[in-house]
Curated annotation (Swiss-Prot):
The keyword Glycoprotein applies. Homodimer. It comes from the Eukaryota. Keywords: Glycoprotein, Lectin. Lectin that binds galactose, galactose-containing sugars and gentiobiose. It is strongly mitogenic for human T-lymphocytes and induces the release of interleukin-1 beta and tumor necrosis factor alpha from cultured mononuclear cells. It has a strong hemagglutininating activity. N-glycosylated. An isoform with Ala-1 missing is found in 20% of the samples. It comes from Euphorbia marginata (Snow-on-the-mountain). GO terms for molecular function: carbohydrate binding. This is Galactose-inhibitable lectin.
Length: 18
């Protein structure tokens, strides 16, 4: 939801974190 707020998930996809 926020630019640059993406982390690698357990499945290798980006997850939105504040």
């Amino acid at each position: 939801a926020y630019p640059g707020s993406h982390i690698s998930g357990p499945n290798g996809f980006x997850m939105d974190v504040k």
